[in-house]
Amino acid sequence: CEKPMAINSAEAKKMLDAAKRTGKKLTIGYQQRWRPDSLYLKEACDNGDLGDIYYGRAIALRRRAVPTWGVFLNEYEQGGGPLIDIGTHALDLTLWMMNNYKPKMVVGNVYKKLGNQERSGNAWGDWDPAQYTVEDSAFGFVTMENGATISVEASWALNIADPNEAVTYL
């Protein structure tokens, strides 16, 4: 199944129930988990080599690299912008490595600051601002039930030095 799994917990539960009922395996397209560096760090986390992990930072940022093909810019069809597209991979890795999936509180903001501009300077070509209905940046902070905290940063269009930053800090 492509990520994210569903748009709400009720739909996700239906998918899990169907998998159990039919005996089929259900997996979500979080391929970053299978990179050698991810597997190495996950093993270190599981072995306790990093101690008590109480802070994580999930980062997926691009410098003016908005995908202009497909349905990426259509909120109705895509469900959201960079948080749904690339940020979900960084957040998945962070939660997986921390082995912590129980949020207590979430706060965040989304921004559409560049999507309404005619001339974008975008690496993958210009877009029609009238068709750009998703956010171009999303930032959040998650407090987990055990007191751990996670900072989340996702953007297709920040004015940053590095053209592509995808990092998980623990």
Residue locations for each model-derived region?
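NAD(P)-dinucleotide binding in Rossmann-like oxidoreductases
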Residues: 128-135, 145-170
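Short, well-ordered turn and helix-capping elements at secondary-structure junctions
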Residues: 5, 60, 154-158
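Short beta-strand scaffold segments in enzyme catalytic cores
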Residues: 140-142
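Short, well-ordered coil/turn segments that N-cap beta-strands
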Residues: 22-25, 52-54, 136, 146-150
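Beta-strand-loop-alpha-helix segment that lines the small-molecule cofactor/substrate pocket
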Residues: 1-33, 48
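Residues that form or flank phosphate/diphosphate-binding pockets in enzymes
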Residues: 10, 36, 161-162
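Predominantly a Rossmann-like dinucleotide-binding segment in NAD(P)-dependent oxidoreductases
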Residues: 25, 32-132
